[in-house]
Amino acid sequence: MDQGAPAKPSEQKVPSLRTRWEILLLTLCLLHGSSMTPPHRRSHSRWLQAGSPQFRTHLYNVEAHTAPTPLCCWKNSLSGTNALRGPRLVTGNTGGAVTIHCHYAPSSVNRHQRKYWCRLGSPLWICHTVVSTNQYTHPDYRGRAALTDIPQSGLFVVRLLRLSLGDVGLYRCGIGDRNDMLFFSVNLTVSAGPSNTTYAAAPASGEPTTASPGAASSAGNGWTSGITQILEGSGSEWDRTVPTTGTSKTTSSANGRQTLRTARTMVPGTGSREEGSIRAAVPTPEGPSPKSRSMSSTTQGVWLWSTRNSVTPSVTTSEGRRQGTTPETDGPRDETDVRVSPEAPRKTTGTTRPSALISEHVTWETLQDKTEVSKQQMLHSLEELSPAPSAQTLNATCLEVASEEGRSIDGSLENTTEESSPPTPSQLSVAGPVWVSVKGPSMKSALMEGESHTRILTPVSTVLALLLIAALILLKRSLGRQRTSQKKERVPRITLIQMTHFLPDKLPDEGKNFQQSNLLPPQASLTVLENDPRP
């Protein structure tokens, strides 16, 4: 009998409630795990196409923080065992070929996974597959792109043939069914030969004389001054330049602003290091914010890194990437030109440094005058001297922090000298954002006012709580009294009716006569009238 009886509703609700609680706890656990896991930092590069018909391409590095997915345990373990590594920058010549080696952990899972080589394309920055192990090759790369997988060695090799300037871009070398699961970025640059033309002029009796590229004048360890002009041609700015030694100084005027450009190179054969610096005599601007862009050039196996700062009217930030327009405006322009001879391959660093007109002191006075940070330019300079046998190396670092319309540009600072001096206060200010702390009686008064408000609110809340409790107690007592009084009023009333039966023998004579006269005849019928209970 009990087995056939249906289950109670309460027993049916128990499994559903347990299931809901389990799902809720699992969700909270996953969310907690993903929030506690530190974000992974992945550095990649993007290409910014300038609006010129000569395809000038500028490469800038961006650091992106990618947070892990909620399935952190499985995803992190998978990425830890399947870490990819390989070259970050690959350079080739027009018509030549490049080979990229992508290494991965030789596990049983990775051996059977899909390997791919894809290219990021604008405007959505979707990575389009070029070639993969699924026997797929993009139509534009057929016959000149190949991918070979070597599972035993944990390596797959990508080879691109017949390179052209159109192949310059950002690529991905990865593993997985999708092109955004596990990968690392590779920058491919194609060199079309020397595209920078240099004109050098040496002074003779106070008048400049034009000299051909490559002409070097040396007088012991002396310096040679002249006028240097760099013309940008087609192709990317990862180009080769003709080695030239000398020093050039140029003073030009752009809307009343003077710019002094200096490029220095030691004479080869002295065993000394090269130095490159720029001293700009520019008043503190209040107009458009500056934007730094970097380029690199090479001279017959020696890579040179130079920094160029120019004024941009606006800087915009979009989803997933940072873009800016850098037109050649009338504003100040600083440029570093560092050249080295192929006979002395060594590290060469060229950076920019402001002059004494834009110094730390002026910047802090501007901040104390409560000038808006979005309309000023903070320049912090640092000079480091490293000893050398015959000459000294000057490494000037400069960080420009500016913003317009609430957006800011963060500059990264890298020191490539072999020896560095201890950090100075200006270097500490360059290393991170500037925080201005305000101390004084205003801060103390604000703190005292906040404490007094807290002290006042605490007793008021306590008194209100006590009053509420007392009111509830009184209300409960009054309700109890009303209920007891109503119960007392509802006491039942009993009415006793006593009926006495008189026998006919014991009736008096008058009563007998009255009874006989009132008796009905035996044939008569007694009719009882009933009252209608309805109104």
Curated annotation (Swiss-Prot):
Cytoplasmic face of the membrane: 477-535
Record-annotated disulphide pairs: 102-173
MF annotations from Gene Ontology: IgA binding; IgM binding; transmembrane signaling receptor activity
Posttranslational modification: N-glycosylated.
Chain positions covered by the region annotation Mediates immunoglobulin Fc fragment-binding: 95-117
Cellular localisation: Cell membrane
Main location: membrane
Protein name (record): High affinity immunoglobulin alpha and immunoglobulin mu Fc receptor
Source organism (scientific name): Mus musculus
